[in-house]
Amino acid sequence: MKKKTAIVSGYFDPLHVGHLEYFQLSKDLADELIVIVNNREQCLLKKGDEFMIEKDRLKIVYHLDMVDEAILSCDKDKSVCETIRMIKRMKPMDELIFCNGGDRQIDQNNIFEFKVCQELEIPMVDGLGDKIRSSSEFSGLIEYDEPNAFNRE
């Protein structure tokens, strides 16, 4: 039997209630939910640092009830294109869908994964959940006298 698998991605740095809504709405569309967690290198590209180390973010996401698999992104840029390709190879018989949160609209100019999803015939769903919070809202509240404890430089 062909399984429908929803794929979501993000930094989840830190995870907040908006992410939980995004995960649940995505899971409601499928039999299985795979969450791609952006890696440390991607955090550095996006915001210069990470609030939580990647392994902690991955473990927290994996232990959520609605999440079936959590995968650390293998990409070296801000996209998760190569990780989506890897999932497609791992699950060739599954019907995959790529879901975006409420703050992202499907547009080839603002979603890095647009072209790879077209190429692999993976439908995209957008607007899942309201923009309740921004992770940067939380991480910006903490000031350090010392360098960030999670900085591995």
Give the role of each language-model region.
Residues 1-153:
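Nucleotidyltransferase catalytic core that binds NTPs
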